[in-house]
UniProtKB/Swiss-Prot annotation:
Protein name per UniProt: Putative pre-16S rRNA nuclease
Top-level taxon in the UniProt lineage: Bacteria
Chief place where the protein resides: cytoplasm
Disulfide bonds: none
Record EC number: 3.1.-.-
Length: 131
């Protein structure tokens, strides 16, 4: 598999956690949190990050219910993934994000904003599943 840079998103209506990683090292790390409820401001910042990091694909956490079923947040994550695909023409992968925020809190050891760490957890799951 050729080396690829990846960005991952832990999508929320109030904030979006972002992580970066690549297929060579197969390691993910938190990048930043976008604190904005204004859609265009979010996409402006995402566009800047995409230009800066030039990822070949992006990963979006899919908010499934605890039983694995869909819930209202699942549709919002799918819509966000479709917007990324449509606006930027990137390959988008969806990854089950169940438990990522709890794991992020455990890793942080605090109740600080954990969205970027949760995005790194989601991306690490994707990288770990690669052949």
């Amino acid at each position: 598999m050729p080396e690829e840079t990846l960005l991952a998103f832990d999508f929320g209506e109030k904030k979006i956690g972002i992580a970066i990683g690549n297929t060579l090292t197969r390691q993910a790390r938190p990048l930043e949190i976008i604190f904005s409820e204004i859609r265009e401001a979010r996409f402006a910042r995402i566009g800047q990050l995409l230009q800066q990091w030039q990822p070949q694909r992006v990963v979006v956490g899919l908010a499934l219910a605890s039983d694995g079923g869909e819930q209202p947040a699942t549709a919002r994550c799918r819509r966000f993934a479709n917007q990324l695909r449509g606006r930027y023409g990137l390959a988008v992968e969806l990854v089950d994000e169940r438990g990522s925020s709890m794991e992020a809190q455990r890793l942080l050891g605090t109740h600080a904003p954990d969205d970027a760490v949760a995005a790194a957890v989601i991306l690490q799951r994707y990288l770990d599943a690669l052949p």
